[in-house]
C-alpha cells in the first residue's frame, strides 16, 4: 500500500531538490558526482523474488536479473546518468522491477562511460551486447531494448545502427525520460527549469560535452532526435510533465509518428525524471511500470 500521495509527492520532490538538483548545479568534478550517485543507490532496494548475478555480455559486464516467473523474452537495459554516471548498481532496483513485471530476463549493461570513454564506446558495447544475445540463441522478436535518460540515446542509436546495418531488429523499444537532444535547445529546458525538482541543464550539458568527443552536439550519432527515424520497432515513451526533458520525449514521438512508426508517448502529470524508480512511494510510478509490462506483453512474439 502506498503512503498518502498528498504527503509523499511533495516530500520526494523536496528531497530531490535539496540533494540531486542542488548537486547538479555545482562545479563538482564528474567523478565526485558519479560517486555520490552510487552512494544514493542504497536507498533503492531490489525485489527479493529475482535472482541477481554479474555476467559478461559481449565486451562489457552486466547485471543479469532473472525473475521467478520468466517467459521467453529478454530486456537489454542501458542505464541513464548523463553519459558519465549510473551503473547496474544504481539501477538494480529498477532492473528487478522491470524483470519481475515483464516476466523477462533482464541485462543491465555496464557500458563504458564518459569522460574516460567518449562516443562511440558505449554504442560499441551495446552493439556487442545485442549480438551476444543473438549468439545465446535469443531471437530478435524476443528481445526488447530499454533505457532511461541518457541511456535512451544509446538505445535509439543502437536501433538505428542495427537498422542501417541490415541486422534483425528487436521487438520493441522502451524509453523512460529520454535525453536525445544533446543541444538542450528545446523549449521545456527553459520552461520547466524551475519546476523540475531533479535535473538542471548544467549537469546535462556537462555530461553531453564529456560524451560527444569531437562531434557537434547536434550530430545525429549522439543526438538521435536528429537521426533518420524511419522503420523502427514499436516504441513506448514515458516522461514526466515537470521535466526539462519533456520536449525530448514529445518531439521524438512526433518525429517517429511522422515517419509512420508506432509509438505510445505517455506524459505523467506532476512527475519528474525517472519517476518510475519511486514506485514504492508514488502510485503514478506503479502505473507506469504496469504500462511497460503491458507493452512488452503486447509486442511479444513468443
PLM regions: where:
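A glycine/proline-hinged amphipathic helix-loop "lid/cap" segment
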Residues: 1-69, 301-302
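Alpha/beta-hydrolase superfamily serine-hydrolase fold, recognizing
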Residues: 15, 53-63, 69-302
Amino acid at each position: 500500500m502506498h503512503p498518502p500521495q498528498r504527503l509523499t509527492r511533495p516530500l520526494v520532490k523536496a528531497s530531490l531538490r535539496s540533494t540531486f538538483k542542488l548537486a547538479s548545479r555545482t562545479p563538482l568534478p564528474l567523478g565526485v558526482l558519479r560517486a555520490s550517485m552510487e552512494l544514493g543507490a542504497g536507498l533503492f532496494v531490489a525485489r527479493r523474488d529475482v535472482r541477481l548475478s554479474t555476467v559478461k555480455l559481449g565486451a562489457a559486464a552486466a547485471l543479469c536479473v532473472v525473475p521467478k516467473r520468466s517467459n521467453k523474452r529478454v530486456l537489454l537495459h542501458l542505464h541513464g546518468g548523463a553519459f558519465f554516471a549510473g551503473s547496474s548498481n544504481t539501477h538494480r532496483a529498477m532492473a528487478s522491477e522491470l524483470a519481475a513485471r515483464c516476466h523477462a530476463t533482464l541485462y543491465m549493461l555496464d557500458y563504458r562511460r564518459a569522460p574516460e570513454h567518449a562516443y562511440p564506446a558505449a554504442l560499441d558495447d551495446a552493439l556487442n551486447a545485442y549480438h551476444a544475445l543473438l549468439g545465446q540463441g535469443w531471437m530478435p522478436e524476443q528481445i526488447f531494448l530499454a533505457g532511461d535518460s541518457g541511456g535512451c540515446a544509446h538505445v535509439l542509436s543502437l536501433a538505428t545502427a542495427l537498422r542501417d546495418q541490415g541486422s534483425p531488429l528487436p521487438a520493441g523499444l522502451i524509453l523512460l525520460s529520454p535525453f536525445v537532444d544533446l543541444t538542450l535547445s528545446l523549449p521545456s529546458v527553459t520552461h520547466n527549469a524551475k519546476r523540475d525538482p531533479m535535473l538542471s541543464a548544467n549537469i546535462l550539458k556537462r555530461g553531453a560535452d564529456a560524451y560527444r568527443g569531437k562531434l557537434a552536439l547536434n550530430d545525429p550519432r549522439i543526438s538521435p532526435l536528429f537521426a533518420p527515424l524511419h522503420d523502427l520497432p514499436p516504441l513506448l515513451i514515458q516522461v514526466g510533465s515537470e521535466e526539462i526533458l519533456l520536449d525530448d520525449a514529445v518531439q521524438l514521438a512526433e518525429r517517429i509518428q511522422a515517419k509512420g512508426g508506432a509509438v505510445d508517448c505517455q506524459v505523467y502529470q506532476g512527475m519528474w525524471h525517472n519517476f518510475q524508480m519511486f514506485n514504492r512511494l508514488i502510485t503514478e510510478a506503479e502505473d507506469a511500470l504496469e504500462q511497460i509490462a503491458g507493452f512488452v506483453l503486447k509486442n511479444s512474439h513468443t
